[in-house]
């Protein structure tokens, strides 16, 4: 309706021109202009409807708006994705044959896959104790095996609710899985103060993909805290995939100041459900890196 009114207004404004010698050309131009606007409006509406049709859940809270969207429902390619603005926080194929597949930043050739395929505890088929700061949709839980223990630390309760309701990584985890709500560093500090050293074989820090960087997780004191919760040969994995910042330099500097060895693992996606990823491996176990 608004477009039609705008078109009529334009016709009135140009009515004086209709008396000129170029009347036919003016009329033809106006008709073409109106058709172009109507066509653009049609495609814009179609785009808006299509983009909204895939969103199956939306939550708004202190940390912003979270959306769960899906595509190809009812097929083997049925995919659900958790996003915060432009940032993807994980996805999952929902068909039974593929739902345990780790995508986005956690695929076989990502830093996560490399770690689990080469960690001594996994190589010798011993149970692993795993910590993860930042839940996402719980994709890392798909890497757990029977006998493993995996504990997630998540600051946003809404993320935990969406991960548990719309994704199955936590429910389908082969190991024992738990989710602790609250700031990851503060929770780790409280555990240490209570004498609850977690003795992790691997600790993943997965909280830096958004626009706002939780700097308190990147300090020397934070890294010292992480390694107090890791076994002597344990591995710290820091996810630094970010659209705006390259955190590899600061992380390497902090790690080296604490006498640790580092390795940057970058992975280019090989499938459409994978994402480009960058992980920094930090460890005292020199043999694991070299």
What kind of feature is each model-predicted range?
Residues 1-290:
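Alpha-helical transmembrane segments of multi-pass membrane proteins
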